[in-house]
Swiss-Prot record:
Gene name, Swiss-Prot/TrEMBL: kptA
Gene3D superfamilies: 3.20.170.30, RNA 2'-phosphotransferase, Tpt1/KptA family, N-terminal domain
Organism: Pectobacterium carotovorum subsp. carotovorum (strain PC1)
This enzyme's EC code(s): 2.7.1.-
Protein name: Probable RNA 2'-phosphotransferase
Single GO molecular function: NAD+ poly-ADP-ribosyltransferase activity
Amino acid sequence: MSNTKHADVSKFLSYVLRHKPEAIGLTLNSGGWANIAELISCAAKDGRLLTREVIQSVVDNSDKKRFSISADGLSIRAAQGHSSAQVDMRYEPKVPPEFLYHGTATRFIDSINQQGLRPGSRQYVHLSADEATAITVGQRHGKPTVLKIKTLEMHQQGFIFYQADNGVWLTLTVPVPFIDSTPFID
């Protein structure tokens, strides 16, 4: 499969499995799982040709491990990033490392310095374990910058953290005092 086709299918899967399953008539269960046969059928009705092999290829070759296929091979879900309140991934709370990183665009820094980090349309704020990943995330929205987050200190003060199957760290919010005041700019 070409890189362009792979990217198109990945974006489509992200859209329907994270944000708008109803756009193609797909139903997710409360854990975010969709039946693969139903996904293929709904996609076909929407004019998109998906096969089990194409879906498996996208799952296997995703560097960010955005999707998971169930143990029985019948269902698929997005690892994290859901905007739908009906999806509850039931992550287990986890103690974070001392620091995690948040990639964003420099144009958002003033707002972040006033409000902290908020999930926006997602359920959680997403944090990365390393600066390189955070830079990649930040550059999707403009000139990237990386914020260093005092996550262990947050945890010690009662904030809850989760880690998605693909390694992305999640929390409900990051108040300003826990954000390193000097962002790293590439």
